[in-house]
Amino acid sequence: MTSPRKTHPLMKIINSSFIDLPTPSNISSWWNFGSLLGACLMIQITTGLFLAMHYTPDTSTAFSSVAHITRDINYGWMIRLLHANGASMFFVCLFLHTGRGLYYGSFLFLNTWNIGTILLLMTMATAFMGYVLPWGQMSFWGATVITNLLSAIPYTGHNLVQWIWGGFSVDKPTLTRFFTFHFILPFIITALATIHLLFLHETGSNNPSGMASSPDKIMFHPYYTTKDIFGLTLLLLLLTSLTLFTPDLLTDPDNYTLANPLNTPPHIKPEWYFLFAYTILRSIPNKLGGVLALLLSIMILTIIPATHLSKQQSMMFRPITQILFWTLAADLLTLTWIGGQPVEYPFEAIGQTASIAYFLIITLIPLSALTENKLLKW
């Protein structure tokens, strides 16, 4: 008799996606980050739901409601810190997952890659709106500065900013709508992640060599479920250690001060995972130019497949491109560091150099591919 796992309409979908799924036998730990992102999303939705039960999206009570969660709710402090640090873990996994896709040429699966880019943008939007909700100093001023960038759009910019604010400044209507979107977007992200998986299973997973893996595939369960559980254990260990030992390591002290529109913090900056883009934004003296560079720093991912000129899919056997890739990784770390520094010498000059290097390296990668093709006489 055939197992219900293979015949039941619902079980059949789960079976073909997570149990009997044919998977390349040589995929490394870099392929673990997909499942870790799923786990991060579940952690964020679960902790977020419990926080939403006690949070009030009103400028007069938002800050005190977060203090109430931390002090008076059973394990409220832990739920809040898991949610805040869980976002950091989410972005660590996101950046590593995207980096793996770039290194091993997974961007050639166009549908999967494009949905992934949309997922990255939506996650960034969700995190930004979540950062505004505690209504601390950095929440208020971060929201004011970032939303005000839209005023750089010709003709409609000023009206667009006021439409987003719901008035003439960041106030109660802004907070209410940010809470609404912050609540609904994770569920849209979950739906998009399902589509992302659907497209991935249409083509099958890539592998480190970049070669066809059809002749050598194994079942996903038990081999890769065990591997994923091990990865998840390490992630949870890191998240709980961060939450319980150094909970404020990645947060801004200014956010423990109630939002005050009359007092500007000495240095307005977003959360650490946006700092690379923030550095690129402020490296350009022109407002519109900075906004365009900021957008391009993320949207450049969509044109990466069109610039792939190598005869090999993966970078595994391409030493020149490998040097460029790891230089790009170091450049992104430099941009992140500079974003947390004040706009003064030497940080300003380093930021401008690193911003130019970011776009230059991405431009040089297709040229290095052509050079490697010539060296290999392809």
Curated annotation (Swiss-Prot):
User: Binding residues for heme b b566, per the UniProt record?
Assistant: 97, 196
TM regions (residue ranges): 33-53, 77-98, 113-133, 178-198, 226-246, 288-308, 320-340, 347-366
**Residues reported to bind a ubiquinone:** 201
Q: Where in the cell is it found?
A: Mitochondrion inner membrane
Q: Which family does it belong to?
A: Belongs to the cytochrome b family.
Summarize the protein's role. Component of the ubiquinol-cytochrome c reductase complex (complex III or cytochrome b-c1 complex) that is part of the mitochondrial respiratory chain. The b-c1 complex mediates electron transfer from ubiquinol to cytochrome c. Contributes to the generation of a proton gradient across the mitochondrial membrane that is then used for ATP synthesis.
Which parts of the sequence bind heme b b562?
Answer: 83, 182
Does Nucleotide-binding count among this protein's keywords? no
Give the miscellaneous note.
Heme 1 (or BL or b562) is low-potential and absorbs at about 562 nm, and heme 2 (or BH or b566) is high-potential and absorbs at about 566 nm.
Please describe the quaternary structure of this protein. The cytochrome bc1 complex contains 11 subunits: 3 respiratory subunits (MT-CYB, CYC1 and UQCRFS1), 2 core proteins (UQCRC1 and UQCRC2) and 6 low-molecular weight proteins (UQCRH/QCR6, UQCRB/QCR7, UQCRQ/QCR8, UQCR10/QCR9, UQCR11/QCR10 and a cleavage product of UQCRFS1). This cytochrome bc1 complex then forms a dimer.
Question: Pfam families, per this entry?
Answer: Cytochrom_B_C, Cytochrome_B
Alphabetic keyword roster: Electron transport, Heme, Iron, Membrane, Metal-binding, Mitochondrion, Mitochondrion inner membrane, Respiratory chain, Transmembrane, Transmembrane helix, Transport, Ubiquinone
A single Gene Ontology biological process assigned to it is: mitochondrial electron transport, ubiquinol to cytochrome c
According to the UniProt record, one GO cellular component term is: mitochondrial inner membrane
Q: Which organism is it from?
A: Cebus albifrons
Record-level Gene Ontology MF annotations = metal ion binding; ubiquinol-cytochrome-c reductase activity
Q: Which cofactor does it need?
A: heme b
Q: How is the cofactor bound?
A: Binds 2 heme b groups non-covalently.
> What is the official name of this protein in its record?
Cytochrome b
Q: Does the keyword Zinc apply?
A: no
